[in-house]
């Protein structure tokens, strides 16, 4: 009888391998577990049997019934899952949209220049300060040798927020603040160097080379024995680092309220190497900034003793430097957020 049970199991496994559908599986299950199946007949016969294997036959029969039922149930569940997966795959709706390719940002040419200037001067021990957008009339004008009513103020007509506060017309107000701070500092040993970078505002008409708002760099170097030779070295150092070692500078006498002596600084034309072209107006030189030794009166107005300390200074427009460095002909290009224009600087410095 046990051999018969094993034979039924082997036959079931063989038949199940041929089954392809749920209906065929249910039919096979009924034929093996139904009331008239061989297994059912074996179990019925055990009631009147007195064989010694009665218990073993009963256990084997029930185990086979359980095996057949669970195996067919698993088969049916697998067939149903495969059918459902196939149906879902055939009915799948693509709810996605083609993504928009994000543009990689690039450094703005003004930021490139600011970062280069910062590196150039921090390498030789200068501090980097942020200029104030809003400043008092005192530090913007009076402490820089531009008292109330001085005609030179007309060149820097600006917006007054109130009677004592203005939008900064130049970053040189930081020179006044630093000089005043150092004069009050008991620990000041007589030497200090910094550059200040900030936005400035003028009542200028906008055109290809002028803007009512722009960025300015101001340098200040205080020392006990500062001379014009130091100023010339700093100017050459900065210009060669910004525009290349082949660049030369030229100093022309000038007049500024903050400095005495004062000079305008020109650099040799990058395009023609000083030979003369339309860029430099056939002079071979391009004006870039104004500089000089801080006026004794400015030192006194800020609490400094000009007999003990002297200082050099210069001021330059960041936009002016960027336009010369990158060959930009119109200052408006720096403010219009033209992506096509700005992408030109994507790989600068790499």
Swiss-Prot record:
**Binding sites annotated in the UniProt record for Mg(2+):** 260
Reaction(s) catalysed by this chain's protein: tRNA(Phe) + L-phenylalanine + ATP = L-phenylalanyl-tRNA(Phe) + AMP + diphosphate + H(+)
Q: Which GO terms describe its biological process?
A: phenylalanyl-tRNA aminoacylation
Q: Name one GO cellular component term.
A: cytoplasm
Which InterPro entries does this one have? aa-tRNA-synth_II/BPL/LPL (IPR045864), Phe-tRNA-synth_IIc_asu (IPR004529), Phe-tRNA_ligase_II_N (IPR004188), Phe_tRNA_ligase_alpha1_bac (IPR022911), Phenylalanyl-tRNA_Synthase (IPR002319), tRNA-bd_arm (IPR010978)
Q: Which GO terms describe its molecular function?
A: ATP binding; magnesium ion binding; phenylalanine-tRNA ligase activity; tRNA binding
> Which Enzyme Commission number(s) are on file for it?
6.1.1.20
Q: Does the keyword DNA-binding apply?
A: no
Give the note describing cofactor binding and stoichiometry.
Binds 2 magnesium ions per tetramer.
Query: Where is it localised?
Result: Cytoplasm
**Magnesium in keyword set:** yes
Under the heading CDD domains, the entry gives: PheRS_alpha_core
Cofactor dependence? Mg(2+)
Protein keywords = Aminoacyl-tRNA synthetase, ATP-binding, Cytoplasm, Ligase, Magnesium, Metal-binding, Nucleotide-binding, Protein biosynthesis
Note the HAMAP family from the entry. Phe_tRNA_synth_alpha1
The record ties this protein, via PANTHER family, to: PHENYLALANINE--TRNA LIGASE, MITOCHONDRIAL, PHENYLALANYL-TRNA SYNTHETASE
The protein's assembly and partners? Tetramer of two alpha and two beta subunits.
Protein family: Belongs to the class-II aminoacyl-tRNA synthetase family. Phe-tRNA synthetase alpha subunit type 1 subfamily.
Q: What is this protein called?
A: Phenylalanine--tRNA ligase alpha subunit
Q: Which organism is it from?
A: Mesoplasma florum (strain ATCC 33453 / NBRC 100688 / NCTC 11704 / L1)
């Amino acid at each position: 009888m046990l051999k018969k049970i094993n034979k039924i199991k082997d036959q079931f496994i063989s038949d199940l391998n041929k089954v392809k559908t749920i209906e065929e599986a249910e039919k096979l299950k009924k034929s093996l577990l139904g009331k008239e199946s061989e297994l059912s007949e074996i179990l019925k016969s055990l009631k009147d049997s007195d064989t010694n294997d009665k218990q073993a036959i009963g256990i084997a029969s029930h185990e086979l019934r359980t095996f057949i039922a669970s195996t067919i149930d698993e088969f049916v569940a697998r067939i149903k899952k495969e059918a459902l997966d196939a149906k879902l795959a055939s009915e799948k709706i693509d709810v996605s949209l083609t993504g928009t390719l994000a543009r990689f940002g690039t450094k703005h040419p003004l930021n490139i220049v600011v970062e280069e200037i910062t590196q150039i001067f921090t390498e030789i021990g200068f501090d980097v300060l942020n200029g104030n957008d809003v400043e008092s009339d005192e530090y913007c004008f009076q402490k820089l040798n531009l008292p109330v009513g001085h005609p030179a103020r007309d060149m820097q007509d600006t917006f007054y927020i109130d009677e004592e506060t203005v939008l900064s017309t130049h970053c040189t107000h930081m020179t006044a603040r630093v000089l005043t701070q150092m004069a009050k500092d008991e620990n000041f040993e007589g030497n200090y160097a910094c550059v200040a970078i900030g936005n400035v505002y003028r009542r200028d008409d906008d055109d290809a080379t002028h803007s009512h708002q722009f960025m300015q760099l101001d340098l200040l170097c205080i020392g006990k024995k500062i001379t014009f030779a130091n100023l010339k070295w700093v100017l050459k150092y900065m210009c060669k680092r910004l525009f290349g070692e082949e660049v030369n500078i030229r100093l022309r006498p000038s007049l500024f309220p903050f400095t005495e002596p004062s000079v305008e600084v020109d650099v040799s034309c990058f395009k023609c190497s000083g030979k003369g072209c339309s860029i430099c107006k056939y002079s071979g030189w391009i004006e870039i900034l104004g500089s000089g030794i801080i006026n004794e009166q400015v030192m006194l107005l800020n609490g400094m003793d000009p007999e003990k300390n002297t200082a050099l200074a210069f001021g330059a427009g960041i936009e002016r430097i960027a336009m010369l460095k990158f060959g930009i002909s119109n200052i408006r290009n720096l403010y219009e957020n033209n992506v096509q224009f700005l992408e030109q600087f994507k790989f600068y410095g790499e």
